[in-house]
Regions:
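Acidic, glycine-rich A-domain
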Residues: 268-406
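An amphipathic, basic-hydrophobic helix/alpha-beta surface used to engage anionic
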Residues: 45-295, 332, 336, 350
Length: 406
């Protein structure tokens, strides 16, 4: 229906244009004289140009969008966007309005006018312009189309076209450099060490020793055995294997972006330490990552954190009850939330008894205090053997140092 209305308006304007030309010619014929013909010939170039423009296809234009950088963008970075407009036919145009339609995800920081320019092509076939996006927010931003608009000098003929051109921009969360340290679980009865598995690194031989029952045949050091006439086996370096499970609360919160930033910081710190980790993130698009280590795991987790949204309608305490049991017991559990609730503390206390180490990181906005109820729940958590650490952004660096001292 909308297309039909636009088509009818275009036809009407063309008919009016021919009518004006006919009226100007008729006036000159009947009136005669220099002035009448001067007005007619003065109007003719504009009239003929309007007729030409009415039949000029804007489909002749191609529009490209390029970014000065991509792939390594983080929250808060700036970006330069270059828009290139090209066409095949060099028909003169008085003006051309080009608008790079801003995604809704950038509407708060990027006014629509920022991506719009008025160009004066004349006979040019190629034009460019640039605009900047400052302080990119975390997330997936999809640029999908351009709007082109031109017209004649008298404002009678106007032509518009939407050019589809998709460009995806993924902005990863920023992070704070921090040092991850293995934690200890403290109960009223005393202190118990965290469950750290000791594994032999069979690629690193530290020495030889006499054979012991249970040693594998592949561990036998044949040269040492031949020299001593006693079966000798290789001695390997022992490495700590510390598994961590991060649970991200995705219920809507004013401090959600800070939570994501802190989560990215600890993901980087844990994997950099050489430990293995997994993540649970439940919302409209649930995500559960098995416990692994390495660069690929970090890429997966950062990709998820770049796109994650605060869209969970389920309290984090209930999620813990239903989801965490699928993971092995000997893990350190780090729960990241913005609010301390009774249900969360009770569920965390249950897992603390089974798993040994549970830490609740409560992320608050700058100068936002802990509520009275939250303070009471914090005492309850301590009695159940659960660490609770309230953090504001400047304190992220010392998150694990302070927990260790708690």
């Amino acid at each position: 229906m909308k297309k039909n209305i636009v088509w009818i308006k275009s036809i009407t304007k063309i008919v009016l244009l021919f009518l004006f030309i006919a009226l100007a010619f008729s006036y000159s014929m009947f009136q005669g004289g220099f002035v009448s013909w001067f007005l007619f010939y003065s109007f003719m170039p504009f009239g003929l140009y309007s007729v030409l423009l009415a039949f000029y296809p804007l489909g002749d234009f191609t529009v490209q969008r390029t970014f000065n950088r991509s792939g390594d963008l983080k929250d808060g970075d700036s970006l330069a966007v270059t828009v290139t407009v090209e066409r095949n036919n060099a028909i003169p145009l008085f003006f051309l309005i080009v608008e790079d339609v801003v995604p809704e995800t950038l509407a708060d920081i990027l006014p629509a006018a920022r991506g719009k320019r008025v160009l004066f092509p004349g006979f040019k076939r190629k034009m460019k312009y640039e605009y900047a996006i400052k302080r990119l927010p975390r997330g997936e931003h999809i640029f999908s189309e351009f709007k082109l608009k031109t017209g004649d000098a008298i404002g009678l003929i106007e032509k518009e076209r939407v050019v589809s051109k998709q460009s995806d921009l993924l902005v990863y969360p920023s992070y704070t450099d921090l040092t991850y340290r293995t934690l200890e679980s403290r109960y009223d009865q005393g202190t118990t060490s965290s469950k750290v598995k000791i594994q032999k690194d069979t690629t690193m031989v530290s020495g030889v020793r006499e054979y012991l029952p249970g040693d594998r045949v592949s561990w036998v050091h044949w040269k040492a055995t031949a020299k001593t006439n006693t079966i000798m086996t290789k001695e390997f370096e022992e490495k700590e294997s510390h598994d961590v499970l991060v649970v991200l609360d995705r219920t809507p919160s004013k401090s959600f972006e800070l939570m994501v930033k802190f989560t990215a910081s600890i993901v980087r710190a844990i994997l950099k330490r050489g430990a293995q980790m997994g993540m649970i993130s439940i919302g409209e698009t649930p995500a559960s990552f098995p416990i692994r280590g390495g660069d690929f795991q970090q890429q997966q987790l950062f990709y998820h954190l770049a796109k994650v949204k605060p869209d969970s309608g389920i309290p984090i305490g209930k999620i813990l009850k239903e989801e965490v049991n699928y993971f092995q017991q000997s893990v350190t559990m780090l729960i990241i939330s913005s609010e301390l609730t009774q249900e969360l503390v009770q569920t965390a206390g249950y897992h603390a008894k089974r798993r040994g180490v549970v830490v609740l990181f409560v992320i608050k906005l700058e100068k936002e205090p802990l509520g009275k109820e939250e303070a009471a729940f914090r005492e309850m958590a301590a009695a159940r053997g659960v660490h609770v650490k309230v953090l504001h952004e400047p304190e992220f660096t010392y998150a694990f140092t302070e927990v260790r001292r708690a």
